[in-house]
Amino acid sequence: MDINVVNALAYEDFVKLFGNVVEKCPLISAAIWSYRPFKDLADIEARISEFIHSLPDSGKEGILRCHPDLAGRDLQSGTLTPESQEEQSQAGMTTLDSAEIVHMYRLNSEYKERFGFPFVICARLNNKADIVRQLSERLKNRRTAELECAIEEVKKICSLRLHSIVLSDIQTKL
């Protein structure tokens, strides 16, 4: 998809197309639409990043709370967004055995209790062993460091989702 096509999208179509590049946060796409025309995909990413970084910590935490637990209840019940379903599947989270599911549940619960938001990692850039290792390691972080780390992971997820949309056929998304 050409950037000119993106720039020509009506507000409603833009939000529909890009509304889940940050999990369950269409407000971000709605806000950056005002910055059109975008120079390129990197410009869209920069605007999203600027928007996220302009938020107070409570806003950043809100973004993180929109993310599902990895291998959690939403995956088990089939209620993930299509993007999250695909990402967790690619990372091997859909093939965990019952002991691994229990272990992930325990780690996810410990993480949420410690930080107040779910563990976020770019699943498409990791496999299940990496995810478990990172989750265990990041439990040792200070809260402020972990908030920044998790937001950086959100930006990686966003970047990959943006690229997937732009490289796909726009007509199938609208």
Curated annotation (Swiss-Prot):
Changing R161Q: Loss of activity. A motif (Microbody targeting signal) lies at residues 172-174. It comes from the Eukaryota. GO terms for molecular function: 2-oxo-4-hydroxy-4-carboxy-5-ureidoimidazoline decarboxylase activity. One of its GO terms (biological process) is purine nucleobase metabolic process. Its EC number is 4.1.1.97. The keyword Lyase applies. Substrate binds at P68, S84, Q85, E86, E87, Q88, F119, V120, I121, C122, A123. Keywords: Decarboxylase, Lyase, Peroxisome, Purine metabolism. It is found in: Peroxisome. Catalyzes the stereoselective decarboxylation of 2-oxo-4-hydroxy-4-carboxy-5-ureidoimidazoline (OHCU) to (S)-allantoin. Homodimer. Belongs to the OHCU decarboxylase family. This is 2-oxo-4-hydroxy-4-carboxy-5-ureidoimidazoline decarboxylase. It comes from Danio rerio (Zebrafish).
